[in-house]
Amino acid sequence: MQFNLKNPNHYGVIKTPEKTYQRYDFLCEYYNVTPEQALQSGTRASGRKPNLPGSETCKPVKDMTFEDIWAAQSRNTPEDIFQFYLDQGAWSSFRQTVRHLELQHMHNFVLRNLIRPGIYFCEYGCGVAPFSTTILLSCPKDFNIDISISDVDGCEHFLFAEWKLKKIIKDRGLKNVNLHVKPVKARGLPKYDKPIDSLVIFEVLEHVLSPIETLNNIIEQMSPDALLLENFIKHDREEDDDLGPDLKSAADERGKFYEMVEDNFLLLSNNSVFADPNGTRIWRKLVKE
């Protein structure tokens, strides 16, 4: 099964047999903005303070940098850190949408290796659920799949992602797609309805409190021969730098995390952790006796 969007270029549209989606349609509808406002609000720039709109599920955020939002209160406990993702409002809804529309070719390429009919697919730390979005916009109308999304409970980009995926399922009449919404709690990791056959955790691990606990929870719920797509961004920072949402606790576990990955998975892609530390890799779960 291969996934190939008709026009995955920077200025293109996404055409399905049922509907044509313009580049920022979902943001424009959910947040009542123009395409120009969507692009401006989601384009990364140093020191920027976008005026982010509110929605039915969040308040507006304006005159603050990303760093200002992080520094607005202490971020010492799991609850403090999770609150950051609520405090940022629609910031990640816009930023991640703009970024991942530019990564559409990559989505297509990796999903060819991860997706087949009848599987239970999980997008962990999903943000706006870009990989799940690509699946739903690319699959045949009769395609059978369970999709589970997980992110911080109650954060705006997670709520936006849920709305977006449900809208695509309804628009396209995807009757054989089952969507499962599994939030991550400050002191509780999600449990899934079925064994996970394929999981994506993309640009997430550097933000989680404990990558090792996260991986353990995932491994315990994976099917034999399950596939894992991951990356774990490594920043070169001074010891006393404020890492913000790139958590020190996550960075401290990076080495042991990859030891655990190599003990439990076989690397399928040709980019090792040593040669390409910030690369995106695909692994297959080992079947242990």
What are these regions (language model features)?
Residues 2-192, 215, 229-287:
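Conserved N-terminal segment of class I S-adenosyl-L-methionine
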Residues 200:
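A conserved beta-strand element that flanks and buttresses the S-adenosyl-L-methionine
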Residues 207-211:
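Di-metal (Zn2+ and/or Mg2+/Mn2+) metal-binding site signature of metallo-dependent hydrolases
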Residues 213-227:
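A short glycine-rich, Lys/Arg-flanked "PGG" loop and its adjoining helix->strand segment in the class I
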